């Protein structure tokens, strides 16, 4: 595939005939972004063709031009679709809803779906390389402002997660000594701005705590609330660390990025 900021183009070569001339999936068009995912006799397409927050379309493997794309999951104003993982009997959709990442598991066998639950108010989650097609096991990574990176194995049939590996933090770190919150601040124009914060338990919430506020909004880059050992010394001295998910990133969807431009 060949991609630029505002367009994509894929070319297909059969795995069984690698010398065959590549076939263009959909010719490049300015403003048309898409990614493709092969499943049996069809493709799933993640695209901004019909919605700025992206939708999921399908087409047969023999008719791949955009005029043949059929809507599978429509675009939504409050949800940005970021990626797909395709399995034999499941489809996992990576979404960003109100700034928080979510994993939606769709079951082809009974046309049902569910979301993997996460118990913290602010966190980061993403799928790993899932290279086995015919399986009910999904691997994903999770971390938050108080939890170091953890890799999970999730059974999409039983809906159970199992820890495979958790990043070790040297120095006697105890995540139970810290707390995180997600709050909303009012912008000058009345827009609600999501903010992720972390602090050490036991501080007085009287407005007098030293605070380090971080914000970055540009190029559609979302600043996720990840774990960092660098801030632990501040938290242990009574600081509150805050990430403001300001406009310019895509935390709240494509318009959040567009509205951050001057």
PLM features: residue spans?
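Beta-strand C-termini and the immediately following turn/loop, strongest in propeller blades
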Residues: 1-4, 14, 39, 44-50, ...
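Beta-propeller blade termini and top-face loops
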Residues: 7-13, 55-58, 220-227
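Repetitive beta-architecture junctions, highlighting loop-to-beta-strand starts
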Residues: 8-10, 20, 54, 67, ...
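Conserved blade-register residue in beta-propeller folds
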Residues: 12, 58, 102-105, 153, ...
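Multi-bladed beta-propeller domains
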Residues: 14-33, 60-81, 85, 109-129, ...
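Conserved beta-propeller blade repeats
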Residues: 24-46, 75-90, 122-141, 181, ...
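C-terminal structured "cap/appendage" subdomains that terminate the fold
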Residues: 88-144, 149-152
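Serine-hydrolase catalytic core recognition
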Residues: 125-262
């Amino acid at each position: 595939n060949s991609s630029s900021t505002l367009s994509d183009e894929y070319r297909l070569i059969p795995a069984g005939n690698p010398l065959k001339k590549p076939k263009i999936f959909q010719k490049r068009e300015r403003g048309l972004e898409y990614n493709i995912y092969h499943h049996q006799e069809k493709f799933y397409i993640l695209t901004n063709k019909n919605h700025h927050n992206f939708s999921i379309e399908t087409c047969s493997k023999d008719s791949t031009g955009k005029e043949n794309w059929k809507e599978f999951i429509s675009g939504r104003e409050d949800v940005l679709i970021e990626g797909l993982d395709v399995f034999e009997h499941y489809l996992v959709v990576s979404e960003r809803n109100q700034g928080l990442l979510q994993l939606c598991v769709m079951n082809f066998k009974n046309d049902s779906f569910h979301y993997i639950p996460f118990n913290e108010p602010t966190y980061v989650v993403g799928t790993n390389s899932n290279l086995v097609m015919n399986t009910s096991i999904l691997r994903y990574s999770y971390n938050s402002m108080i939890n170091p990176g953890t890799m999970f194995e999730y059974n999409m049939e039983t809906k159970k997660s199992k820890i495979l590996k958790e990043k070790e933090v040297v120095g006697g770190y105890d995540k139970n000594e810290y707390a995180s919150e997600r709050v909303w601040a009012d912008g000058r124009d009345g827009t609600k701005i999501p903010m992720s914060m972390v602090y050490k338990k036991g501080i007085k919430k009287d407005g007098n705590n030293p605070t380090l506020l971080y914000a970055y909004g540009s190029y559609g880059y979302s600043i996720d609330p990840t774990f960092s050992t660098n801030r632990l010394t501040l938290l242990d001295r009574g600081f509150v660390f805050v990430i403001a998910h300001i406009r310019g990133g895509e935390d709240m969807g494509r318009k959040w990025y567009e509205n951050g431009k001057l």
